[in-house]
């Protein structure tokens, strides 16, 4: 009995120390929410809403003058490569060496969560519970969900509720393809993911399902393109008891799995995260729990071999809706021979010629 009590005490203190370590790590780490690259600078916003700036060549931080009254919540490049930032109070600004210039102020102070631009350079915003066009002052919410990891209900006759399939789910990833289709997706741990499509040129919701894409087994980590074709690529991965991941190539609303981690032995499977393609060399870069891999992008068929490029040592946190960790790398960018990676807890990393540097160390 005494040994059992002692074992319980040891387990308690181990758990306590682990929780304390995670809390301390979270409290001392500056979290970068998003970033864009426009030569000669790297622009980033923190989770707490402040703006940061680094030089792409020297990787040194540069002081920037901006209105400290604003809480920045989104950042993007428009089609003319202007840096645009959104705020918690529903304001859009152009950002340049001359500071902030007000571009648009929403009629209501909705928090701007994501910003994208179509080929006509028209902005589309994700605000709470809607996709919104500030140009036409129009919003869209009626996206059809044949499958959803979330149960959404609508109240009727004051007291009754019924489950509905037409609604808007806030996405974690937003991407505009070469045909001006806005791809919005997110996932909810082991329960799978969602996909919402919108034609930004015709300004209408697309309810066409993507064939061969099972949303219950869909865990989107990034959306990207090869820079040459109309194909859309989505990296999907989760760590739930075991690591797993896939990369889909989608054309004409049909998904083809070009990387299937089930082809690997169980103990060698990879938790696939953010990915990107260097269009010049047609090289695919893939973030995993073991490091960043590279492989030639196949013209057709599946990826057969991947090579470990680098293995950054990163902090991680637990995935709340699965038995495992969150992906530590949120975004990958290949720019002028350097691989930039936006991390969840370690700021922005840069890999170049075998060396890793960090722009923001905890």
Q: Regions from the language model: what does each represent?
A:
Residues 48-53, 91-94, 131-137, 190-196, ...:
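Structural motif
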Residues 39-40, 80-82, 120-121, 179-180, ...:
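Short coil/turn segments that connect the beta-strands within blades of beta-propeller domains
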Residues 45-46, 87, 127-128, 184-187, ...:
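Recurrent small/Gly-Pro-centered beta-turn motifs in extracellular repeat architectures
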Residues 28-37, 69-78, 109-120, 148-156, ...:
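Repeated scaffold domains used in trafficking and secretory/extracellular systems
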């Amino acid at each position: 009995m005494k040994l059992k009590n002692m074992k319980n005490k040891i387990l308690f203190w181990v758990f306590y120390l682990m929780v304390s370590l995670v809390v301390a790590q979270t409290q001392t780490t500056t979290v970068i929410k998003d970033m864009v690259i426009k030569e000669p600078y790297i622009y980033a916003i923190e989770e707490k809403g402040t703006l940061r700036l680094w030089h792409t060549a020297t990787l040194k931080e540069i002081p920037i003058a901006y209105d400290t009254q604003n809480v920045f919540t989104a950042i993007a490049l428009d089609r003319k490569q202007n840096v645009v930032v959104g705020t918690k109070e529903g304001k859009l600004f152009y950002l340049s060496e001359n500071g902030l210039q007000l571009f648009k102020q929403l009629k209501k102070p909705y928090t701007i969560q994501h910003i994208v631009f179509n080929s006509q350079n028209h902005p589309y915003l994700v605000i709470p519970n809607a996709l919104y066009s500030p140009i036409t002052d129009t919003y869209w919410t009626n996206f059809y969900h044949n499958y959803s990891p979330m149960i959404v209900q609508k109240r009727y006759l004051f007291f009754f509720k019924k489950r509905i399939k037409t609604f808007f789910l806030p996405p974690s990833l937003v991407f505009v393809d070469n045909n001006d289709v806005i791809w919005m997706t997110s996932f909810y741990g082991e329960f799978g993911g969602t996909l919402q499509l919108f034609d930004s040129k015709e300004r209408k919701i697309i309810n066409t399902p993507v064939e061969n894409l099972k949303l219950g087994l869909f865990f989107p980590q990034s959306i990207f393109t090869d820079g040459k074709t109309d194909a859309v690529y989505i990296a999907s991965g989760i760590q739930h008891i075991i690591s797993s991941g896939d990369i889909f190539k989608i054309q004409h609303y049909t998904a083809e799995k070009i990387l299937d981690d089930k082809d690997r032995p169980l103990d060698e499977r990879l938790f696939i995260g953010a990915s990107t393609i260097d269009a010049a060399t047609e090289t695919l870069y893939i973030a995993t729990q073991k490091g960043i891999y590279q492989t030639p992008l196949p013209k057709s068929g599946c990826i057969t071999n991947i090579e470990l490029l680098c293995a950054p040592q990163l902090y991680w946190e637990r995935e709340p809706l699965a038995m495992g960790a969150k992906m530590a790398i949120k975004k990958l960018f290949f720019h002028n021979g350097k691989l930039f990676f936006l991390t969840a807890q370690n700021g922005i990393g840069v890999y170049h010629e075998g060396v890793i540097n960090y722009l923001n160390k905890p």
